[in-house]
Amino acid sequence: MILGHEASGTVLEVGDGVEHLSPGDRVAMEPGIPNPRSRASREGRYNVDPDVRFWATPPVDGCLTEEVIHPAEYTYRLPDSLSYAEGALIEPFAVGMQAATKARLAPGDVAAVVGAGTIGIVTAMAALAGGASRVYVSDIAPEKLEKLAGLDGIVPVDASREDLAQRVAADTDGWGAQAVFEASGAGAAYGFVADVASPGGVVVCVGMPTGPVQFDVVAAQAKELRIETIFRYANVYRKAIDLAAGDTVDLARLVTETLPLERSVEVFDRGAEARPTDTKLQIRVDGSR
């Protein structure tokens, strides 16, 4: 099957009745196609529609090909200020947007993100855009944290040398972070996320562990924490594009290297190595820039 679910490109043709797009438009594509008549879609939760057809999810092919056919309602024109590379990164950024939306951040809140991979970084960006005054981002790989240098409002925490909960507590007079995002997918993280959160705060489960995890419910109850989960995203793609087009979000810094389509196997092999110095490896189809 064809892989790939993060894409941007150029419109070649449009069907009858499509008025917001024209051939030649540069676009980003939301990869999940729900059943518009499902209850989930009608309630605005189309991301959890059991019938959703999502790129590169068997048996549905992905977008790593020169041409795709995609519904116009899930195809968004890119502003001139965004490159094709940034357009393809709208998809992971939408995950961060969904997480920040579910957190219900208030202006000035302190946030913390566990995991400095792509999803962790875009979640931190979305939290800042959503009103957080600062975001602590922790990871056990210091190489990943180096990519955060120069990002205003982000405080890197090397988890191999420093305890996240203790650092946040020290900087907040013992109160904690109003929003904690678990974005690593590591089951062990659920052993301490409640310690990082402030009383009345929220823990948002973003990363997806490979199996069941242990979570101290009593610790969460003692602080009256709110627990939120996300699955992909819904109704945030246009907002994600608008934010990325401004000055507050820099998605281009996530791209480690771009290689041509004929070197795709090399890209996937390198991705499987999980080098801590790699954030996003992109594959370019001829004609994109």
Model-derived regions: residue spans:
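Conserved beta-strand positions in the Rossmann-like core of class I SAM-dependent methyltransferases
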Residues: 12, 135-136, 204, 228
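Residue-level marker of beta-strand positions
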Residues: 6-8, 26, 40, 67, ...
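Glycine-rich beta-strand-centered segment in the early N-terminal region that forms part
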Residues: 1-39, 79-81
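C-terminal hydrophobic helical "lid"/dimerization subdomain
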Residues: 191-195, 234, 238-289
